[in-house]
Amino acid sequence: TGAPEEGVKGQSLFIVPKYVVDDSGRLGERNDVVVAGLNHKMGYRGTTNTVLSFGEGRYRPAGQAGALGEIIGREGHGLAYMFHMMNEARIAVGAGAVALGYTGYLRSVAYARTRTQGRPLGNKQPDHPPVPIIRHPDVRRMLLTQKACVEGGLALVLYASRLVDERQTAPTEEERSAAALLLDVLTPIVKAWPAQWCLHANDLAIQVHGAYGYTRDYPVEQLYRDNRLNPIHEGTNG
C-alpha cells in the first residue's frame, strides 16, 4: 500500500491465510495462495522452506481474482513491524550460531583426544607409539581458536539477552533506557560476530577431523552446513 514515491514508508504488513476466514471465525473458501515449489537447501534440511505464489488465478476467493490478505497494524508501518520482530530474532541467530559452533568444538576435542597419529614433537624414536593428535601444537591451536570464538560469542549473546530483560524489568527508567540504547548498538554485532566466527570454528572442526570431517560419518560437516545460513539471514553480513 502507499504511493510508490513513499518507498519503504509505503510498505504494509499482511497476513494471507490458506483459507478465507469469515467474521465468525469459520474457515471458508480457498484463498489464492499456493506452494510453488520447495527450496533445496545446503543445510537445515530438517525444516521445509518453500516458494509461495499469490494471485495466480488457481482459486477465486469471493469470485474475484487475486489473493485476499488482512493488513496487520497501521498502513505504511510494515517494515517497522518487521524490524521489531527481527531485532530479537537477530539475537536468536547469534545464539544459534554459538550453539552450532560450540557443538563442533566439543566434537573436535573429543576426537582429538582419541585419534592417534604421529610421534610427540621432538621425539625421533621410530618405534615410539603414536600419540593422540591433541598433543600436536597445531591441533591445539585449532582447538583453542574454536574455544575463543565460541566462548566469546556465548558471552556476547548472554549479555545481550540480559539487556533484553533489563530493557523491560530494570527498577528505574534510567536503567531501562540505558539497556535499550546499548541493545540498539549491540544487536547487529550479536547477530553478525558469532555468525561469522562460530562458522569459522565449524570450519576448523572439520579440519581437526581431517578427511573424516569431510564425510557424513561425523556430524561436523552438517554443523558447518547448518551454520552457513547464519551470516545470511535476518540481515546479511558484509
Regions found by a protein language model. Name each.
Residues 1-238:
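Internal glycine-rich alpha/beta core junctions
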